[in-house]
């Protein structure tokens, strides 16, 4: 099939941006990555050359001034998201924004209103909404397969940061948006909102298991880790349904990523023990009351059109597709920056609940955005 792109995109960030955003944009029939940004121009030029991109920049204003750039993806460290996204929106560029959205919900709300004023489409990269097994669970819940819900539990227990010799960088610093909240809980807050609706209140305990890490830019001197690597969060959902979230990035041999849903008619379990790929490997188990547990097969109509060795790529292609369609149809994408505000809100409230050591109420999202 001949590619006929109608959205030319600049990628900001050479980590996840280079590994996932560029190939996703190059694969999608209606998009083309044409530019890359990195603070080190030599690095940007190297990435541009290896990916056949026309432009490389270490100056964001120059990138945004390029009339050939219609949109940007932002995969820089979280502490840069707000300013970069704000500049892009003000320049009239559509934005695909990595999570966490910003460092504070007030910043995300500002981006939400700014995007509406400038009539640009901003989509958060909440990938689990686009994974077939998760989509099927959403359908089953919508059909009322479990009846009235009684308990929801999330375990996301991985060892990506379990090695104490892993380098100290922005990820180790809470003030720069590092930690398990931004990396993992940002997704969890979104998919719980998608599947079950808004939370009413929450309580939390955040902890740091590995207190120091070596800084390779400072002779491997040990530096303090201020960003949580473990988060235990309790939510109260609609109808007072309890939800327990257990997240850690320092679990050697952790069980992976599991969502357990218990209701009056039985239970659903969605999970993967694949610690090397957070998309591949999800399975669904249904245990109706009075019957044996059975594994469910995801309908082929929900399958990815193409799967890749890197499991992250297929759902991001679907995110890109929703983004492109929303731009072409001049409509708000799903998920939207409104959902990004909600995820950021719960991240902020989690920190507040931990610091104050008591339950905190979750404000109504529409009222928050109307202020």
Curated annotation (Swiss-Prot):
The keyword Disulfide bond does not apply. SUPFAM superfamilies: Glyceraldehyde-3-phosphate dehydrogenase-like, C-terminal domain, NAD(P)-binding Rossmann-fold domains. InterPro entries: Gfo/Idh/MocA-like_OxRdtase_C, Gfo/Idh/MocA-like_OxRdtase_N, Gfo/Idh/MocA_oxidrdct_glycsds, NAD(P)-bd_dom_sf. The keyword Ribonucleoprotein does not apply. It comes from Synechocystis sp. (strain ATCC 27184 / PCC 6803 / Kazusa). Its EC number is 1.-.-.-. One of its GO terms (molecular function) is oxidoreductase activity. Signal peptide: none annotated. This is Uncharacterized oxidoreductase sll0816. Belongs to the Gfo/Idh/MocA family. Keywords: Oxidoreductase. It holds the Pfam family GFO_IDH_MocA.
